[in-house]
A protein has these predicted regions:
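Long, contiguous, secondary-structure-rich segments that constitute the structural scaffold
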Residues: 736, 740-790, 857-868, 872-980
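Fe-S ferredoxin-like electron-transfer domains
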Residues: 2-19, 74-233, 238-264, 279-282
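Short beta-alpha connecting loops at secondary-structure transitions
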Residues: 32-33, 96-102, 223, 472-480, ...
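Catalytic alpha/large subunits of respiratory electron-transfer oxidoreductases
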Residues: 123, 191, 252-716, 749, ...
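Long, low-complexity segments enriched in small/aliphatic residues
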Residues: 607-608, 613, 762-857
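N-terminal cofactor/phosphate-binding cores enriched in small/glycine residues
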Residues: 39-96
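Short, structural beta-strand-to-alpha-helix junction motif
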Residues: 45-49, 93, 366, 647, ...
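Glycine/threonine-rich phosphate-binding loop and adjacent beta-strand/alpha-helix elements that clamp
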Residues: 414, 715-736, 745-754
Length: 980
């Protein structure tokens, strides 16, 4: 326990100690004396950190333990017995036998003089303003006993008398261009922490120190505003600033928080830990949690700042019902809404049969909520017609890794990338979709000054940021044609096999011999060579050979992949091909290697783990397994159907045919996110009872008959599971605006359907999951609260915190299984009518269908979906930057503005899908993965031409949307509507 009087600097609100410099890992330790206290630390530890570990606070300004030591502020000086001078404790390593003093009359005088210089160029009221409780400069001034400043610089005199020694920073204008934070140069002491955070933590290098001496200042780019610079608004600079020169606008507007709660971000699959800092019942800011294993104190613009949607005026907080989708909504009580939904589902099953209804779970909801929805479908509906949005993103990951390795999850932790020598990124754009992990990856690619950076292979049709940015460049960019992934991965395997680059000992020990021999014979065929596939993929054979050799021989090689792998007609085949490559080179089962799917949403992994697929119970156990099924039957007190139920696309087809009549859609917007929008909308219009549980009237809810208000991540308790199988707590920081958390709504619906559920807290739900699921047997809230997080498998056979690396001694299935990957061309081929290939993706500032981020200031960066088109293709069509262009496929047509760019290759166009009015999925088709029905979002044959007006679909959508909003308005504001 630290002596409070000596405790290192920390913000009492956050209860996180800042040790001044980063932790060092070393087998060798050293022992020294600091102010008479003996302390033992790993070799390489700074004196500042050693002192902090001993409970001694060495004053400092430029140092923080999230950044490498810089040694510029001269406040952290110490005395070392037997040495001359006063070295900086942040840059001086601890040595055996050292005797160090951090306090002496001389050190006090030195620090006081330095602090007076800082304060002379700082607002005078900072010394006396109690509101600046978190300002480290004020704390350091107090420690140095600085109450007044002897130097009469302009900052203190309030005039231009400081001009003789440099610019008067106190007269510099604030930069308030960023919607989330301000930069006040008057408070800046040019400690460079913000600059170093932008470089070391984020890797954007958007900030710099301009000028020299007293004229030095922090500059965003070439003296640009933050908003107009390359700043990505991750918040690292704000977090690093010791003086409130960089500060959240929410703090300025609402005041400083008075309490905090640790929770988990509800955006992407990185699963960043945050502290929700509150004032009363109001969220003031979200601060990245230093001890969060997934993010280690870093954040992105979405998680750090874009949480305001939780209290947006569009939130629906009253249950609503209506008979037809053309009727006005009617606000009702919770009991009336639940009873109505239950009676409708019962009526449909009595009229059309037990299998006429089903449910869809959401990857935005907690494990506990998802578990309850699939349980409701199986136990209350009595069928297996349950599916999840993972169907349309990472279902091929589950199939492919399950077939080859034996379990449906990535093999590594995010931290593992720090030990990779070769990184291969396939069909993923981490800087936009997984930015916090991307920053960690970029640090490894840059190197640390001692160790060289890792080599990088990028496989992507577009020139994503990782291909060529100021500080990271790919060694190989394999810019393949969309839809040819399997041809490329098979060609790489051909090189590894035919050039003798296999890890023979690993294969002999760890893999199935027969499957390996069959695979080796298959890939060695001349038809699978890079030369044979060159015209198919569009990638020069020598590039494929070079990349394959690098992956096989470059040391620890790690593969990270995204939806550019899975969302194809051969998505499952490609996942298998990746697994083959990793096994063939021995790159599974230790740190720095592995096969790592970058999951798109916050709980995609968890929604699959919880049994959301129609053929699997929790823990990826098949519904047809009598032993497994009997365990759940005994626990749930029902007889379960042994046959798998309908997948999401099957539900739509059955609805269009008239046999599927009711849907419980929990937290998922299938109209905007699923392919072939017009088919999905038609299917919903044919159903007699669509129940949507969400926080906004999303596109799917406009086809609903019952609306059950959901809760945001700030209003719920539970857990999320991220892309590294890490289970983290989600903690309620405010009461549900609608009065009930999502799990409570599902419990009430199940009870009304006749299947009783008696949970009183999500912890009880997780206890049931742990009791029924071997891989979760050791998971508990108590353990997560104590350790911060755990990783499944977590049971008696693992460490207490679970399993960081899978398949260490053997694969989950026993022996790794090789499977042949025969390339089959996509049905989406270019023709005279449709000569271009469309692929889709995301952008940094927006998230998925945009329901959350569109209701935040993130729209300032990206307020519409645009179509990227290569200059050659644009010129051929007479298209210029910003022109409206029509995009037509065999499924439909929409209109977007054009962005003419060389990020895409000739023959390829690209767009995002964040805005419903864009209709990006109006033009994606019904083509899907052969094994899982995952849609082929990444390959659609299209034509692009200049147009002068919106498409027919967009006109119809605009009219339908206006009508639905009017019907909502009639329910929410009946008196005002009547008056009009």
């Amino acid at each position: 326990m630290l002596n409070p009087s000596l405790a290192p600097l920390h913000d009492p609100l956050r209860l996180e100690i800042d040790y001044g410099t980063p932790r060092r890992e070393a087998a060798e330790v050293v022992t020294l004396s600091i102010d008479g206290l003996a302390v033992t630390v790993p070799k390489g530890t700074s004196l500042m950190r050693a002192a902090a570990l001993a409970g001694v606070n060495v004053p400092r300004l430029c140092a923080t333990d999230s950044l490498e030591a810089f040694g510029s502020c001269r406040v952290c000086l110490v005395e070392i017995e037997g040495r001359k001078g006063y070295p900086a404790s942040c840059t001086t390593p601890a040595e055996n036998g050292m005797t160090v003093r951090t306090q002496s009359p001389k050190l006090k005088d030195l620090r006081r003089g330095v602090m007076e210089l800082y304060m002379s160029d700082h607002p005078a009221d900072c010394l006396h303003d109690g509101a600046h409780g978190a300002c480290e400069l004020k704390q350091m001034a107090d420690l140095a006993d600085v109450r007044e400043v002897r130097y009469n610089a302009g900052a203190q005199a309030g005039a231009n008398v400081g001009a003789a020694i440099g610019a008067n920073h106190c007269e510099a204008a604030k930069d308030e261009s960023n919607p989330y934070f301000t930069f006040d140069p008057a408070k800046c002491i040019v400690c460079s922490r913000c600059v170093r955070a932008c470089e070391e933590t984020q890797g954007t290098f958007a900030l710099t120190i301009a000028g020299r001496g007293f004229d030095s200042r922090v500059s965003a780019g070439q003296d640009q505003s933050f908003m107009n610079s390359e700043c990505v608004s991750c918040g690292a600079c704000v977090e690093a600033c010791p003086t409130d020169a960089l500060q959240e606008k929410s703090v300025i507007l609402l005041g400083r928080p008075d309490r905090s709660e640790i929770t988990t971000c509800a955006y992407c699959g990185v699963g960043c830990g945050f502290k929700a800092e509150m004032k009363g019942s109001e969220v003031i800011r979200m601060v990245p949690w230093k001890d969060g294993k997934a993010n280690e104190g870093h954040s992105c613009v979405k998680g750090r700042f874009a949480w305001g949607y939780a209290t947006h005026k569009d939130r629906i907080t009253q249950p609503m019902i209506r008979a037809k989708i053309t009727d006005p909504w009617r606000e009702v009580t919770w009991n009336e809404a639940i009873d109505h939904a239950a009676s409708e589902f019962k009526r449909l099953q009595k009229t059309y049969g037990r299998d006429s209804v089903g449910g869809i779970t959401s990857s935005r909801c907690t494990n506990e909520e998802t578990y309850l929805v699939q349980k409701l479908v199986r136990a209350a509906f009595g069928n297996n017609n349950v599916d999840t949005c993972a169907r349309v993103c990472h279902s091929p990951t589950g199939y492919g890794l399950g077939q080859t390795f034996g379990t449906s999850a990535g093999t590594q932790t995010f931290k593992s990338v720090e030990k990779a020598d070769v990184i291969m990124v396939i069909g993923a754009n981490p800087t936009d979709a997984h930015p916090v992990f991307a920053s960690r990856m970029k640090r490894r690619l840059r190197g640390d000054g001692v160790n060289a950076g890792a080599k990088l292979i990028v496989v992507d049709p577009r020139r994503i940021d990782l291909v060529d940015s100021p500080h990271v460049k790919a060694d190989y960019h394999l810019a393949l044609k969309p839809g040819t992934n399997v041809a490329l991965i098979t060609a790489m395997a051909h090189v590894i096999v035919t050039e003798g680059l296999l890890s023979s000992d690993y294969i002999a020990e760890r893999c199935d011999t027969k499957s390996f021999h069959d695979w080796r014979e298959f890939v060695a065929k001349p038809d699978n060579s890079p030369e044979a596939f060159e015209t198919v993929t569009g990638v020069p054979a020598d590039q494929v050979r070079g990349a394959a050799r690098l992956y096989a021989t470059g040391g620890n090689a790690a593969i990270y992949y995204g939806l550019g792998v899975t969302e194809h007609a051969q998505g499952s085949t490609m996942v298998i091909g990746i697994a083959n490559l990793a096994m063939a080179t021995g790159n599974v089962g230790r740190e720095g290697v592995g096969v790592n799917p970058l999951r798109g949403q916050n709980n995609v992994q968890g929604s699959c783990d919880m049994g959301s697929f129609p053929h699997e119970l929790p823990g990826y156990r098949h519904i047809s397994d009598t032993t497994v099924r009997s365990q759940f039957e005994a626990a749930w007190g029902v007889t379960l159907e042994a046959e798998p139920g309908l997948r999401i696309p099957n539900m739509f087809d059955a609805a269009a045919d008239g046999s599927f009549k009711g849907l419980y859609c929990h937290g998922e917007d299938i109209v905007q996110s699923d392919p072939d929008t017009q088919h999905v909308a038609h299917a919903l219009s044919q159903m007699e009872c669509v129940v949507v549980q969400d926080i906004f009237l999303n596109e799917t809810a406009k086809y609903a008959h019952v609306f059950l208000p959901g809760s945001s991540f700030l209003e719920r308790d539970g857990t999320f599971t991220n892309a590294e199988r890490r289970i983290s707590r989600v903690r309620k920081v405010m009461e549900p605006l609608a009065g009930l958390a999502d799990w409570e709504v599902t419990v009430k619906l199940s009870n009304a359907l006749g299947y009783p559920m008696h949970y009183t807290h999500p912890e009880e739900i997780m206890q049931e999951v742990a009791a029924l699921t071997p891989t979760f047997a050791g998971v508990s809230y108590e353990k997560i609260d104590r350790l911060g997080s755990v990783q499944w498998p977590c049971n008696e056979d693992t460490e207490e915190a679970g399993t960081s690396v899978l398949h260490v001694d053997h694969f989950v299935r026993g022996k790794g299984r090789f499977i042949n990957t025969q390339y089959v061309a996509s049905d989406e081929k270019v023709t005279r009518k449709f000569p271009l290939l469309l692929t889709t993706g995301r952008i940094l500032s927006q998230y998925n269908v945009g329901a959350q981020t569109r209701r935040t200031p993130n729209n300032l960066w990206h307020s519409e979906d645009r179509l990227e088109i290569h200059p050659h293709d644009a010129e051929d069509r007479g298209v210029h930057e910003g022109d409206w262009v029509g995009i037509e496929s065999r499924a439909g047509q929409t209109v977007l503005r054009a962005t003419v760019t060389e990020r895409v290759q000739p023959g390829v166009v690209y767009t995002t899908f964040h805005f419903p009015e864009s209709g990006a999925n109006v033009i994606t088709t019904d083509s899907s993965d052969w094994a899982t029905n995952c849609p082929e979002y990444k390959v659609t044959a299209v034509q692009v031409m200049p147009v002068a007006q919106p498409s027919t679909w967009q006109k119809d959508y605009a009219a339908f949307n206006r009508r639905q909003l009017d019907l909502l308005d009639q329910a929410q504001h009946p008196a005002e509507v009547m008056a009009k």
